[in-house]
Amino acid sequence: MPDCYIALGGNQGPVRETFSLALERLDQHPDISVIKTSHWIETAPVGDQTTDPFLNGAAHLSISLSPESLLLELQQLEADMGRVREIRWGARPLDLDLLLYDQLIIRSQNLVVPHPACWYRRFVLDPLSEIAADVIHPEKQTTIQELRQRLLIKPFQFVLAGLSPKEAALLIENLQHKYPEVQFSSWETQGSAASITPEPTLIVWLGAPSSTIKFEDLPLIPRLDLSDYQNNTERIVHVLQSALDFQ
């Protein structure tokens, strides 16, 4: 049976009780077995849509459902627990994300696996590393524990790619005052990862029309494609909140 890992989150109502009920419901499903769960950890919210802290955790499932069928089960369980999908990063009683489904890589209209943000979000990686430390991330080709450890290295090296040096400098100026502990730089200015020491923690590709750099040219582990987002500053702040402002 395939091994799957899911993330649990919530900040409305009795979240611990909601987690317990959700896991009980999953374990009662004839095609789902809950193998192991992490500790629950309290984390700061991302964005400014809510100020209430979240409870987060992870669970290891053994299933005989397809990825798409499992997603539907998770979404139905969220709805049954009162989840309403209206505001991104908003308050919610229960959030269930499918992180990994064996070593499958899925890119469909309704489902992306591995979860595209699971490799750099501390509120996902910390609990997930408790129960899946040696599991290989199928895209990054390194373990969950190693992905988490990369985020702990100081100074935190954050590289912007896919912008002209002038565009990158303006964006860095906007970001530096908010995150003075982060070392920001431009890929186009540096020239390559070899000139950035230590290895960048994250390389965010913004894919401006003026860029001569392709996303596929960037190092595999730290690269993150944000080219589809309109507000670069806001999106990068959300990424940094997820990677840095853990608790």
Model-derived features: where do they sit?
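Redox- and metal-dependent alpha/beta enzyme cores, enriched for Fe-S-associated oxidoreductases
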Residues: 162-176
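Flexible, gly/pro- and Lys/Arg-enriched active-site loops
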Residues: 38, 46, 53, 71, ...
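Nucleotide and nucleotide-moiety/phosphate-recognizing core
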Residues: 2-8, 12-88, 93, 102-103, ...
